[in-house]
Amino acid sequence: MVEPQVAPIAPMMRRIRRIHFVGIGGVGMGGIAEVLLNLGYQISGSDLRKNQLIQRLLSLGAQIRIGHDPQHVEGCDVVVVSSAIDEDNTEVSAARGRLIPVVPRAEMLAELMRFRYGIAVAGTHGKTTTTSLIAGILGEANLDPTFVIGGQVNSIGANSRLGKGEYLVAEADESDASFLLLQPLLAVITNVDADHMDAYGGDFTALKAAFLEFLHHLPFYGLAVVCLDDPVLRELLPGIGRPVLTYGTCKEADYHLRELKQTQGQTQFQVARPGKDNWLTVVLNLPGAHNALNALAAIAVAHELGIADSAIQRFLKGFSGIGRRFQCYGEIATPAGKVLLVDDYGHHPRELAATLEAIRAGWPERRLVVIFQPHRYTRTRDLFEEFIRVLSQVDVLLLLEVYPAGEAPIGGADSRALWQAIQTHGQVSPILVEDKEIIGEMLFDLLQEGDLLLTVGAGDIGALARRLSISLEGKR
């Protein structure tokens, strides 16, 4: 077999030596920084606080400072900014004053993708899992892809990797419309839902138009892979104007599944594929019908790239997961007895509903105790009624205060308002937790043997899950 070669770097990047990242601790920023570091560029960066990703980049040779200062951009050739960074940031202003190019994260990702076979995964929900599955299957087939993913791939302990093959697999982020900077050869869209609406002026039509424009960035010989189960994607289908493959649960989809069965954390199903008479039997080491659809998208991509069925089946069965995507900490021995602890990144009602459905299907006999941290006041406001409906379905509910993600509080869109509304709804009596530090003591009285404890949200609740996995056992 011929050893794959690293794809060439864009010619214009040859003039670039040092690249500075403002907000380097973000998962998308840090992933790109690691790939560039491994390509031989000098990487520097700054952020407001240190985290595991920054520690990893430091160990790889990046120069990172905590806090922002104009002097940090001295000597750099280009500055990459996260969408979370304000325009008046002191480092950004200093770079512009020195006529140093300032580019958004997605533009740098587009440069990495430009001279490779770019595979971009977009969609409101399921991007990280689908991207991880595609990259993993390509790796299993010895295609050695480069990838940049919005979550830590457990098997390698990182969210990005520089490969020697021709493929680059990445998430395409619609939250700030930056995915419109990408020009992949193959694009996947998992679904389109109302989220990040502030970036689109609160106009769902504008959001749909952005997804359609994203697909129009494909070349005429490219390929769009879209989920036919999603009503919005069905609506957009006639306007795509590029080669299209569909996937879903309905028989009219090019790739469709049947006989879906879940046993605890594993899901089994069969897949029909165009041009194949036999059904492909798949065992996926993830729970839930939503993850089966994510895997189906990855199977469609893999099949189109000519990857053998055996490699697809082998990888999906052995998939070790992604950090904070239904991350199972296993059975924790508490004073009340053994409790199964699961942590998940879900922060939209549709994501919460999918996770709860997977839990009820895989562990129907367990009482479900949920600790939920809402993410952003705007999302809580915009999806308030949907949050009430979904969260009312659990057995025990603890509500943490909204994780603001830089937003100012909005009246009637905080956790107290959510708590009151769920109480009025009457199906569950939620507990408002105003101090996360005492939640371990609260759980001491609430938990029962055999419970499934789910921590869920996109803020800092993941750190709470890690602490609980230790502290609850310590109270035995």
Curated annotation (Swiss-Prot):
It is an enzyme of class 6 (ligase). GO terms for molecular function: ATP binding; UDP-N-acetylmuramate-L-alanine ligase activity. It catalyses: UDP-N-acetyl-alpha-D-muramate + L-alanine + ATP = UDP-N-acetyl-alpha-D-muramoyl-L-alanine + ADP + phosphate + H(+). GO terms for biological process: cell division; cell wall organization; peptidoglycan biosynthetic process; regulation of cell shape. Keywords: ATP-binding, Cell cycle, Cell division, Cell shape, Cell wall biogenesis/degradation, Cytoplasm, Ligase, Nucleotide-binding, Peptidoglycan synthesis. Pathway: Cell wall biogenesis; peptidoglycan biosynthesis. One of its GO terms (cellular component) is cytoplasm. It is found in: Cytoplasm. Cell wall formation. Belongs to the MurCDEF family. This is UDP-N-acetylmuramate--L-alanine ligase.
